[in-house]
Amino acid sequence: MLFLCYPKCSTCQKAKAWLEERSISYDLRDIKQNNPTVEELTAWERKSGRPLKKFFNTSGLQYKALGLKEKLPAMSEAEQLALLATDGMLVKRPTLVGEDFVRTGFRQAEWETALG
């Protein structure tokens, strides 16, 4: 299982602690140092069954600085994927990628359901 986070993010810290309390093993990836590729994002979007917009960190400084709330609707999916792949700070975090699921953001009930 892959756990993507930004170490300074308090929500990521809570999610990490939650995983560790349950002895759930994962591979840790700093989303700022090693941002997802277009290929990974494409696969995760398909696996998640959610729209690509759910992968954007809409609360982030980068998202706001780039004016993405206004720009995203006019962008193609390929353009959105390319943009997400340029900067891990644009990606919603934490992101948990399992064999048959992807969860963005830490909502404990969703993670419990996904991890069975």
Question: What are the language-model segments listed below?
Answer:
Residues 1-22, 26-31:
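Local sequence-structure signature of Cys/Sec-based thiol-disulfide redox active-site neighborhoods
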